[in-house]
């Protein structure tokens, strides 16, 4: 829905938003989870994108409901978000993607204090890294701190291994996108320094870091950083990701990535609705920033 609105399809965005509310949204603002194969793992992630869509469509009734819902999953002390009902009850794991995108959506909604708390959570997570040149651990346990031990078959869900390809590179971009937004709201340049550290860390990854479907959010973060820094290095990263994003779009207009989100990707030539909606939004934000002169 946000992707449709940013692409200029306002009526279609409004119609789809209305359909989602009628079909999937419960009275408390939660989704029923039907039709989403990754819902149990990233429980509140879709609410963040719905909140951004509601803001774009000036649906303030929905903005309030989803803002309140998301803030109910934020730890009031450390600023991270519990991605599932179970983790909130346990006061357990807070993973980077859900935490970052939820904070960005709340920043859009004017809930700056909540977003700033998440910014401090990100700084703490980054400063706790044993060696960011080798790995980016991106899950924080509320009781034990940075999670560095996990089952080998789930390693991709806990850390970016800089020596391997096809990692969840989007973590770096989410960090840069949020911190660029925090600088815009607060004028505090320390947020730009933090965003720079996230983007600089991508240089330790393999050469596919800007060419995977999981790289899309790196382009987003670099684009929002470039918008406020006019740094040629930020622009170069955004351009690299944007170019790959354009060339990987299927002839029918959609995108797909079998290693992200989908547990049942379907026919190879088809696009994935969730990924396509996100990539349309990311592409729009990159285009806007890349149109600016240095």
Model-derived regions, located:
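Glycan-recognition and catalytic cores of secretory/periplasmic carbohydrate-active enzymes
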Residues: 1-294
């Amino acid at each position: 829905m946000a992707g449709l609105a940013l692409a200029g399809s306002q009526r279609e965005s409004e119609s789809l938003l209305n359909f989602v509310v009628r079909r999937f949204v419960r009275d408390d603002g939660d989704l029923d989870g039907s039709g989403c194969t990754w819902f149990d793992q990233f429980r509140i992630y879709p609410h963040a994108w719905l909140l951004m869509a509601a803001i774009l469509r000036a649906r303030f009734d929905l903005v309030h409901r989803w803002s309140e819902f998301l803030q109910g999953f934020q730890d009031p002390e450390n600023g991270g978000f519990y991605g599932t009902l179970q983790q909130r009850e346990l006061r357990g794991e807070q993973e980077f993607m859900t935490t970052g995108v939820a904070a960005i959506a709340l920043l859009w909604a004017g809930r700056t204090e909540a977003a700033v708390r998440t910014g401090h959570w990100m700084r703490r997570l980054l400063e706790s890294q044993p060696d960011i040149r080798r790995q980016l651990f991106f899950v924080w346990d509320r009781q034990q701190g940075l999670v560095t031990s996990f089952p080998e078959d789930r390693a991709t869900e806990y850390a970016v291994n800089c020596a391997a390809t096809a990692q969840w590179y989007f973590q770096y971009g989410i960090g840069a996108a949020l911190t660029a937004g925090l600088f815009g709201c607060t004028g505090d340049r320390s947020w730009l320094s933090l965003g720079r550290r996230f983007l600089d860390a991508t240089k330790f990854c393999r050469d596919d870091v800007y060419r995977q479907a999981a790289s899309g959010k790196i382009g987003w973060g670099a684009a929002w950083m470039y918008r406020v820094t006019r740094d040629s290095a930020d622009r170069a990263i955004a351009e690299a990701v944007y170019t790959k994003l354009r060339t990987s779009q299927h002839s029918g207009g959609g995108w797909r990535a079998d290693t992200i989100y989908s547990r049942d990707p379907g026919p190879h030539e088809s696009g994935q609705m969730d990924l396509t909606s996100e990539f349309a939004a990311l592409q729009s934000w990159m285009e806007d920033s890349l149109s600016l002169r240095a």
